[in-house]
Amino acid sequence: MTNALSMLGIFSDVQNEIEGKDYFVEKDGVKFAGTHLLLDLWGASNVIDPELIERALRDAAEAANATILHSHFHHFGPDGGVSGVLVLAESHISIHTWPERDFAAIDIFMCGVCNPYHSLPVLKDVFAPKTITLSEQRRGLIP
């Protein structure tokens, strides 16, 4: 089976394990690609240390039973924020932090049997926000 990535010469070690599986989700009689959680963490701690942030996102992915493929994190200087992403076989988790505002924006998009809600306690423990705003989107709704 040819896909767009293989046409570009990009291959994943996980490709053979997941090829042919349907990772769409069915919930409440609706079928869709996956659940995308958008989190705004206000009054958050630990928003400067890229190693701690990467560990937190890895722990969050593991709590959701996701498969981590790659990670990349960038630190914007000693007192600057961090932007980073975990690429998952089931989609991604990304973060952008603004330490000057004690703020972190986190996206968790997962398909298949992973449960992105299981990531939330891990993130709450690490970042200890005063306020959390959470919204859920069902991506790829089948008409």
Task: List where the protein language model places each region.
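Polybasic/polar functional segments that serve as interface/processing modules
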Residues: 1-143
